[in-house]
A protein has these predicted regions:
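Hydrophobic core of transmembrane alpha-helices in multi-pass small-molecule transporters
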Residues: 4, 72, 84-99, 224-225, ...
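Extracytoplasmic gate region of multi-pass secondary transporters
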Residues: 13-17, 208-267
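Intracellular juxtamembrane helix-capping segments at the cytosolic ends
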Residues: 20, 99-113, 320-333
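Interfacial helix-cap and linker-helix signal at transmembrane-aqueous boundaries
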Residues: 20-21, 52-53, 134, 138-146, ...
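Helix-to-loop junctions at the C-terminal end of transmembrane segments
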Residues: 45-58, 267-278, 364-365
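C-terminal ends and interior cores of transmembrane alpha-helices
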Residues: 67-80, 289-302
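Cytoplasmic helix-loop-helix junction between adjacent transmembrane helices
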Residues: 89-126
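Helix-loop-helix hairpin linking two adjacent transmembrane segments in secondary transporters
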Residues: 124-175
């Protein structure tokens, strides 16, 4: 639930974009910049939140993150200037949600599960994206008629409601409740340490080692494109884009909800395929198809049938890139550094999402249309696929095991 609320808070900026524009008269680029900053901090805080979980504990880090999210969004109810929105929904909520991001799932998995770690982490990752998209129609319903305060209040109360549950119901270690990690042999064996950075300096050191390898930059760059084409563009601007074509916010949010449902299927299937096929080939297919679909979207008739087909197709590919990216990180950076390196690769994802969240709004403000933004993003998807194909042909890389 904490992961869901954190991701849901970040996706809420897409719901309130048009209502804020109508209520305050702020331009689309200004509103988009705040969404971009929040997305960027959401990713950047992750590696350092892992260090905080090691020093003060998972529960305290969660409480701090949820408290900051609740306070910053609640305070925004009284905002009157763009910088109020930037501070509350960009800076403060970005930091707070970053402390309760995917790194939390990884920390809990490593501390509480000795076996089935991949399955549990996959479920947490998929359900976070799926859940956030599923609840968007309700938030869009609250924003009918240009209302934005009911949406903000709902998100704030959701963050606040979780605080007592975390404070009283989240043990720090399995031993605190007289048990051991799931699947652990020997009931008194201590839990294994988290695979994230224990200190900020260790996170930086892992980044320095990884940056010397071309594979890091390839994965960082392609994950940049992943964020650019999902959270940043579709997640932030699809509702507004559909509004330009006369589609009501609730119906547009329903498309995101449908994507969320099929994301669960696509991500699970991607994990199964990653265990059996070369992850580089999978990434080539995922990025190539995603890019072509984004290029095609602006030229559809925006009827119910065409948008439904797009939502299903795009939902299957929403975060299907995560399992093969993690697999390549494990193969190239080793068991010790791979989780930390993936945390930095995920920063690239959020950088791409931030670039699209701001850039698409700027393009819409300058041209009056989202068409160039979707075509450009689609082009980046195709380029990412071609770079992966070039890497596969020039570099043999570690052997990929096949059953």
């Amino acid at each position: 639930m904490a992961l869901l609320v954190s991701a849901g808070l970040r996706s809420t900026t897409g719901v309130i974009m048009v209502p804020l524009e109508l209520h305050f008269g702020w331009d689309r680029a200004t509103i988009s910049f705040t969404a971009a900053l929040g997305i960027f901090l959401y990713g950047l805080v992750g590696p350092f939140a892992a260090a905080l979980m090691q020093s003060i504990g998972i529960r305290r880090t969660m409480l701090a993150g949820l408290g900051l999210m609740a306070a910053s969004t609640f305070a925004s109810l009284w905002m009157t200037q763009p910088w109020h929105y930037l501070l509350s929904w960009g800076v403060l909520s970005g930091i707070g949600s970053g402390a309760v991001a995917s790194v939390l799932g990884a920390a809990v998995v490593n501390r509480w599960f000795a076996t089935r770690q991949g399955l549990v982490m996959g479920m947490l990752s998929a359900s976070t994206a799926t859940g956030a998209l599923i609840f968007l129609p309700f938030l869009a319903w609250l924003s009918q008629g240009g209302a934005w305060k009911p949406v903000v209040l709902t998100v704030s109360l959701a963050c606040l409601a979780l605080i007592p549950f975390v404070a009283f119901c989240v043990p720090e270690h399995p031993g605190d409740v007289g048990t051991s990690r799931h699947g652990e042999i020997g009931g008194n064996a201590p839990g294994s340490p988290m695979k994230q950075a224990a200190t900020a300096s260790l996170a930086i050191a892992a980044l320095v080692r990884a940056a010397r390898k071309p594979m890091f930059w390839l994965l960082f760059g392609t994950f940049f494109v992943c964020g650019l084409t999902t959270n940043g563009l579709v997640g932030t601007h699809l509702i507004a884009f559909c509004g330009d074509h006369g589609i009501a916010p609730v119906k547009a949010a329903g498309l995101l909800s449908l994507m969320g449902l099929f994301d669960l299927v696509g991500t699970t299937a991607s994990g199964w395929l990653t265990d059996r096929y070369d992850p580089r080939r999978l990434l080539f297919v995922y990025y190539g198809l995603r890019g072509l679909s984004l290029i095609a979207l602006p030229f559809l008739d925006f009827g119910t049938a065409s948008l439904t087909v797009f939502a299903i197709f795009y939902g299957l590919d929403w975060i299907a890139t995560v399992p093969p990216t993690v697999k390549l990180a494990n193969l190239h950076f080793g068991e010790r550094d791979a989780p930390i390196v993936f945390g930095w690769i995920a920063v690239g994802h959020q950088l791409g999402a931030a670039a699209a969240a701001f850039g698409a709004g700027l393009i819409r403000e300058a041209t009056g249309s989202y068409l160039p933004a979707f075509v450009i993003a689609g082009g980046f998807g195709v380029l990412a696929a071609l770079f992966i194909l070039a890497m596969q042909s020039r570099q043999a890389g570690p052997a990929i095991a096949h059953p």
